[in-house]
Amino acid sequence: MRHRLSLMACARWEADAIAEWLLYHRAIGFDHVYLYCNDDDPAALYAAVLPFLGGPAPFVTFHHFPFQGQQFHMYMDGLRRHRHETEWLMFLDIDEFLALRGGGDAHGLIDRLPPNQGCVTVNWLFFGHNFHAERPTGSVLGTYTRRAARLHATAKTLTRTACIDPDRIDRRIFFWHGWEGLLMPGAATRTVLGDDPEALPNDGVSITDDALASRMIGRAVLHHYAFRSAADLRRRWERGAGGDFHGQEMWKRVADADRVEAELAPMNEVEDRFLADVWAARMRAGAEATRLLPAPPGPNLALRRAATQSSIGPFSRGRTVAEDAAGAVNGAPTGGFQFHTAEEARPWWQVDLGAPSRVHEIRLFNGLDSPTMAARLRAFAVETSRDGTHWMIVHVAHPTDPPVGGIDGAPLCLRFPAPVPARFVRIVLRGGGVLHLDQVEVYGEAAP
């Protein structure tokens, strides 16, 4: 088979939310999505998913189904076309996100299942509108953090496709919520905890055993962002009530009766930031992974601190040693030199961090005006001192070492396994010549 674990979804008026939904479910392990567009015109949704359609192994298979609200027939078409391409298939809407609160990825729901288990059911956990009158733009996961206190009794199905025979499926059964005996003989259906879903205690709306519900939520649950604003109740009716969407007319009646906030109040009872925080952390980690340089481990203690150097020369930028040396701690790397000593034996530059500190990392940005100038920073030492008199060498560079870079993405980054106590940091050229750098950054924190 092409895929082990896939999603099938139908979407109407979801162009603004589809990208995050696809990115999220790909991130948690789904291999493919079969997406049925039910918009009158597929252009907007097609444009939104276009980045997922290309390449040798596209993440999305896109179909436009023009008959409004015919969810049953969309899914039946999908089963006939695609069920032999994937081992497992889950039916989701674009306002449903699978939350794996027990850890792992989506494959963990089907790993180690007995061969006779044909279906896993995952229950809804309704999230509210967070009291928005109109839909805000941006992330669904980051915006909606209020939810119902109780786990909903309704579930969606994750099914082994070998157990599905389309000819056995009854039109009256919404099989994406439960197969009701339509799977092949002997195929068992179980909850995420391995229980019989038909035996779950419920009042027709919610699971009534709170301890059981808590365990189910702690394993895996569907965050259902059905109403993203007060205006969404009327929006659900406006987008169409044809076919299997006929039940959406009830929300128009609620809106017309001015009962919107009362209807949505039970969905906003509890603050729950699980997916908001998980997704934000994933986005931060992804962004950090793109850095040419890792994020600094704390504040730059050298920034705009008092600095000095051994001399000034004809190419110095400042009129005094302090004025010239300050260029290397101005926080504005340029790729060129920002201080320049005279030619002399063992030229040096140093900075006073202003207070006793614990240094975790020192970064040296070389000037890159020319290869010849950059090569002058070869044989040198980095030293630290607590008092400005007694110095400890923390790094020695040799003439055979690779040249130090700078804003080209290759500065010298000295990371210390244990914090180095210091108030002063100095760079010393070990032979004769000139010393010039772009920036010196010192990361750490004040000593306790």
Spans of features found by a protein language model:
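Catalytic-site signature of metal-activated, phosphate-bearing donor transferases
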Residues: 100-294
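N-proximal low-complexity "stem/linker" segments adjacent to membrane-targeting elements
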Residues: 1-23
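Acidic metal-phosphate-binding loop of nucleotide-sugar-dependent transferases
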Residues: 94-98
